[in-house]
């Protein structure tokens, strides 16, 4: 018996032309790399918005859609396959190498997204007894999932319903399971997944953070694209900002929202509960037709549309729900391990959201704990990097299996006081200001 499989037969000596694909299969964006398997170098990289977004910007909306009709699960699968087709075509055009003929593709994604890819019932991930249809699909031929890909797909296994292959992949990149120090790994975006531990033990947990952190809330919330406000500063009552591509603003993305909220709190435009103070600035206006206050962060004269861009009280309240969920996940996993915030030696933050956001602003509003800043390390895409590690080093497959066997998973849905803790975390940064001493010293 052998674990080797012939995927293709080519004429001549093709050993110098040996390529593979690494994929970060995200709920919002999918990234694919073409990798030279001889050198390990990246030949090309492409990313596109996941075509599944037409069925919902967040995973729960897509699951609801899939349950409405038996054919809808196939709609989601076809949308995924179409996204992969776009990436294969883009890589081929950019590099001149036919990406669809690569012998292997490593796919790193969360458990729900893998169910969408395979056309499986994703509701099993969220519903008791939390038993996914498949947590370890292993190797599949591209044609088995309907892809115009001639090689084998290897889908990185999940540790649980919420701890998917993207987190397992990230652990291979960070090597937390080999470290003496206690490390926390937080991959945050539409969902939040955490792992806490070291070489002796590991505890993992996850939950839905919602699309707010990536900008998908509010009337003018948007993904990080040209025209999106990505940085905000308030000084002497005046708002300044930058936009992606230096264009006139058309909306605000996740990093801009964090800056805006942090700056409004530090300048007393909002109070601890996130309520706007109409006396704090003439930029805080009352919307008669909506019966609520809003902060104008770009005037009609400044914006691309000719209309003012504003963040309403409703927008703030929705965002605080999301940030509270993120912080409470961290709090619960620390308690599960009997570890205090001070005992965390390293905190790795992964995902597009933390990579492009200001850490100080995120701590100011209470998304992350008030740890010494040197303990934080931003890692742009551990899911993709871990997939590439597996692609170029098959010996680490066995290491990954051992890692999975030694990980204990926490179900946040089963934490009895999770919602009570969330209520305290809905404040900026928290009801217990002593947990945020550096922010307490700065708030006016």
Predicted regions span which residues?
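Helical "lid/coupling" subdomains associated with nucleotide-phosphate turnover
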Residues: 62-71, 75-95, 104, 113-187, ...
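Short, surface-exposed beta-edge/turn micro-motifs
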Residues: 18, 191-192
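N-terminal glycine/serine-rich phosphate-binding loop of ATP-dependent small-molecule kinases
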Residues: 1-116, 124-126, 444
